[in-house]
Amino acid sequence: MSDQINEYTKPKGLENVGATCYMNAVLQCFYHVKPLSSELIHYNFPNLSVNQIPMTLAFLDVVKNLSSGNNNPARPILFKNVISVNPLFTGIQANDSKDLILYFLEKIDQELTFLNYFSQNKFFFNAIKTMPKVFKPELQYIVELFMTNHKSIFSDLFYGFMKQTITCSKCHQELTNYQIFNFIIFPIETVYNSKKNNNKNNNNYKNISKSTYSPYNMPPAGKPSYTSNSEYGNFYNNYNNNNKSSNIYKNANYGSYDNNNKSVSLIDCFENEIDDINFKGDNQIYCNKCNKLLDAKGKNIIFSSSHVLILILNRGKANKFECDVEFEEDLDIKKYVENKECPTKYKLIGVISHLGESGMGGHFIADCRHFDNKWYCFNDSIVSGPSNHYNKKGIPYILFYLNEKYI
C-alpha cells in the first residue's frame, strides 16, 4: 500500500456490498478531500482495536485501500459493518447519503477527540481575533466549549460558525446567537418559490445542521450567553421506518431529467439563507428587556466558514421537487461571510448525484476531482473518466467544496 496521496494515486472504485451505493458515494467524496486523506493515511493506532475506535479504523481502511497501487476495486465491508450498528444503516434497504454524512462526521470526530488526535490549525481561535469586542466574551466561551469537545482534523476542516442577530421590534435590543455547523441544507423548493414570488421564507435558519451550542436563555446585551449542547439524541433510532425499501433500485429511472424550465443558482440558495427573517405570530421571540413575546427581525450570516463546505440540495424525499440548480466549479462566498480572514474561495471537489424519480429509492453516484486535478465518475466499482471538468449526471444532491488553497 502507498503511504502517500498525490497526483500519481490512481482512482479506484468501491464494491457494492449490499445496497451501499449511498455509502460508496459518501466515502469517495470524503476520500477526495486531500488534506484529510493525506493526513489520515499516516495515522497508526497499533494498540487500539476496531471495538474502541470503529469509525476511525473503518474509514482509515477505506483510505488505505483506495490509495493502494493495485487496480482492483476496494471492498468497504469493514465500514459497512461498523455503520450497521445504527439501525438506519442495517440490512439492504434504501438509505440516504445525507444521513450517513451526518452520522459519520459525528462519530469519527468523537473518536479522534477522545484520542486527542487533532491538527495544529487552531482555526476557530484565530477567528476570535477579528470579532467585534462587544461579542468576544460570548463567542470565546462557545469556541472554547467547542474545542473542548472537538479536537480532530474533522472539526478543523468541516466545522464553521453561523451567526444570527435578532432585533426586537419594540425596544430594538439586539441579541446575537452563534451556531456550529458542518453542512448546510438548502431547501430548493423554498429557494425557487422565493425567487419566483420575491416572497422570502422566514424560517430558513432551521436548516443549519449539526449539534449546536445555542443560547436557551437570552442574556442582557453585552453579557455572555449560557449554552446548552443540543444533540441529535435518538434521531437515528427513531427514524421513520417508512423510508425503508427492500430494493434500493426499486424506483430507479435512468432517463433524462426534465426540469420543467425551473432553475435556481447556488447563489440564490445563499441569498435565501442569509435573507431577513420575520418572527411573527407563533414564531414571536421573547425579549427579556420588554419581558414579553414580540415580533422581531433576524439576520443570518456565516461568521466563520469551514475549509470544506458540504451543501445539501434538498428536494424532498417522497416526491422530489424538480428544479435545476446551477453551480460552478469555482465558488466565492465572500459576500456571505462576516470574518474575511476565513476561507471564502472554494473549488468544487465532489458531487453526489441521485438517479431515480423519487428520493425514496434510486441510485447514488459520486463525481470527484481526483488528486491529478481531473474529474472521474465513481459508480460503485466502475470508474469512468478522466475529464477536465465536472459533467452533470442525474440530479446533483450534495456538493463538496474545498478551500482553494488545498487544490
Identify what each model region corresponds to.
Residues 16-29, 54, 58, 92-103, ...:
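Active-site nucleophilic cysteine motif
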Residues 8-16, 87-91:
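A short glycine/serine-rich beta->alpha loop
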Residues 17, 161-164, 280-283:
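Short metal-coordination and nucleic-acid-contact micro-motifs, chiefly zinc-binding Cys/His arrays
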Residues 15, 166-169, 285-288:
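Cys/His/Pro-rich metal-binding microdomains
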Residues 1-9, 30, 40-50, 65-69, ...:
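Exposed substrate/partner-binding surface patches
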Residues 21, 168, 311:
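Carboxylate-rich, divalent-cation-coordinating active-site regions
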Residues 32-179:
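Papain-like cysteine protease catalytic cores
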